[in-house]
Structure formats: C-alpha cells, structure tokens
Amino acid sequence: MLLNTNFDPHDKSSCTLTYEQDAQWLQAVWRGYVDPAEAMRGAQAYLQHAAQFPCAFFLNDNSQLTGPWFESLDWLAHVWVPRAVQLGLRFVAHVVPADQHYDVLTSQLLQGQQVPFELQVFQELADARHWLQQAQQANPALQSAPGLRAD
C-alpha cells in the first residue's frame, strides 16, 4: 500500500514509502541522487506514517541510491531514531547502495553508539527481506498487521 512519495522533477530522484501488507513491514525505496532536503522529507514521512501504521519492522532500501544518503546525522540520531523507537520500530534491514559496501549510516551514525533497535546492513535486497522474515518469525508478538489509528 503506497503511503507517500517524494519526487524531485529536476533530477528524478525519489523516496517511496509503502506498507507491504503481505510482508507486514514498512518499506522505503530511495532512488537517484537524494539531496539533504529530500532525505529529511523522506525520513519525516516515515515518522508521520509510522504513527498511523505502527510497525516493528522496517526495510530501508538504498540499493538504487547514488551519492550520500543523509547529511543530517545529528537530527537522525537525536530526533528520528528516538521517535521511530517510540512509534514501535524494533528491527531495521538497511540495504546499502549497489556501488558501496557501506554508507554514512553504518560508518558514522552508529560509530560507537548503541541503537535502540536491531539493525542489520545488507548488500542484497533479497537478503534483507529474508532477515526481516526471520525476525518476524522469532518475534510473533510484534508481527500484527497495523491499522489506521484514529488519533
């Protein structure tokens, strides 16, 4: 189910957020060169929709991303992460860009820090999906299909 799309008509970059009903997780797919403002909008869209669709599992797919992923690491670490956890995030499968074996998230944000959810980094989307499925099987109490909240 499509929840949000941010699209830049100038360079065709985008961030699409969906709730994958069969898999029961939120998924963000980033494409192209995402500038800092676009990255912030995409991250904020996740928080907005996670409030309506609380979900413990998140697949963050950067495999089609070019360039740096996120420049505001301080905001990500001190605002996004705590809010996402408050909204129920417990497992994140993070797929790095195809031309890289690491990215800013794994090399800088988490350097020496404990994150309050389980984070695994993958080079292949299929491996990330498989890991999230295993996490769901190991944590069946967290695997309930979210519904719209009437806040």
What are these regions (language model features)?
Residues 2-151:
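Amphipathic, Lys/Arg-enriched alpha-helical "gate/interface" segment within cytosolic domains
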